[in-house]
């Protein structure tokens, strides 16, 4: 008997994205290893940083697409554990050392002493990775990451000294941000939508995780805020 059932194209795409993400991860690891072996003056070359930055950006998009597919199909589950924020943010910052140095961007981290919190590490790292990618793209010369307790929430913020978020983006609810996709300007806002969807999976009682976009902050530019209950 012939099976005429059409294949699920979204599943095919998800499988392809998963394979591409793994391959790109290996490529990123190889690039980092090669950069470690380069003379100091070569590491700061713009072309080296561009390869790292663009590869990280593509990898971030693939992670988001795969995460949203799993979320839509109820396949995304949280793996909650307790983490030290200082260690987590230091690790993430180290990942961007070469990129920031080549762009003459100063990165600082301010965390409340001995601050720990419960959350899904991989999901939050994905959100932070996208926020740092965006900040490095639009900042002038400074980025600051802060983490503190804000009421019943852990508040992580990424501040930059760029021009800030457009008013249209600030006015749109994060969950509806994809309505403003503009392929002509390269603004898909996929990262913001992904962050909004996955942070709200973090629930404590009647409190839900969420994000907030604002301007001003500690450096006068854009502020990307992550609230986790």
Q: Model-flagged regions — what are they?
A:
Residues 53-61:
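Short alpha-helical segment of the dimerization/phosphotransfer core of two-component systems
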Residues 159-186:
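Glycine-rich/acidic phosphate-handling loop/turn and adjacent ATP-lid/helix
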Residues 73-78, 116-119:
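Conserved micro-motifs of the catalytic ATP-binding
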Residues 26-41:
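Conserved C-terminal segment of the DHp
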Residues 81, 106-115:
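Conserved catalytic submotifs in the C-terminal HATPase_c
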Residues 200-217:
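Glycine-rich ATP-binding loops of the HATPase_c
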Residues 142-152:
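Short beta-strand/loop element within the Bergerat-fold HATPase_c
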């Amino acid at each position: 008997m012939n099976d005429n059932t059409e294949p699920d194209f979204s599943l095919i795409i998800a499988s392809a994205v998963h394979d591409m993400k793994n391959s790109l991860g290996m490529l990123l690891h190889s690039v980092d290893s090669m950069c470690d072996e380069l003379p100091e003056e070569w590491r700061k070359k713009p072309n080296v940083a561009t390869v790292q930055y663009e590869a990280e950006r593509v990898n971030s998009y693939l992670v988001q697409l795969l995460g949203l597919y799993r979320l839509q199909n109820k396949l995304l589950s949280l793996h909650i554990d307790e983490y030290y924020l200082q260690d987590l943010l230091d690790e993430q910052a180290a990942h961007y050392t070469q990129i920031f140095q080549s762009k003459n961007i100063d990165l600082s981290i301010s965390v409340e002493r001995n601050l720990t919190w419960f959350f899904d590490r991989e999901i939050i790292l994905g959100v932070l990775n996208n926020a740092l990618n965006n900040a490095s793209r639009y900042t002038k010369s400074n980025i600051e990451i802060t983490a503190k307790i804000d009421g019943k929430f852990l508040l992580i913020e990424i501040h930059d000294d760029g021009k800030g978020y457009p008013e249209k983006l600030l006015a749109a609810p994060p969950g509806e941000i994809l309505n403003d996709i503009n392929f002509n300007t390269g603004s898909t806002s996929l990262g913001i939508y992904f962050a909004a969807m996955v942070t709200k999976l973090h629930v404590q009682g009647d409190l839900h995780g969420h994000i907030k976009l604002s301007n001003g902050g500690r450096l006068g530019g854009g502020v990307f805020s992550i609230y986790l209950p």
